A protein has these predicted regions:
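Cysteine-centric segments in proteins
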Residues: 1-107
Length: 107
């Protein structure tokens, strides 16, 4: 995972285990479940009650950017004319390509 500290100050505690990101022992996201055919951007904020929410809130805590799903093409038999047929196969989710941007908890 690529981690960017957006500004100066203390950041939220986080842990990563396989494809799961846990923030402050309060919110867990299995990031592989959010992978799509297009780039995905997830905002994590504190709401007015000091609870973590996904989406916009009172104050940014983190942003997660997941790149679009990638594919390979593998030969899968031949057609009736003897030409090779190819199957579109998704590449396994790669946490090393996910970007986590952390915002200061102060301010």
């Amino acid at each position: 995972m690529i981690v960017i500290e957006k500004n100066i100050g203390p950041k939220i505690d986080y842990t990563v285990e396989e494809t799961k990101l846990t923030l402050n022992d309060e919110m867990m996201l299995d990031l592989s479940k959010y992978e799509r055919e297009f780039d995905v951007h997830i905002d994590i904020c504190y709401n007015q009650f000091g609870m973590l929410v996904m989406g916009l809130g009172e104050r940014y805590v983190a942003q997660i950017d997941i790149p679009a799903r990638e594919y390979t093409y593998e030969q899968n038999g031949t057609d009736e004319e003897g030409n090779p047929k190819y199957e579109k196969v998704p590449v396994p989710f790669d946490m090393d390509k996910v970007t986590l941007t952390l915002w200061s908890l102060e301010g």
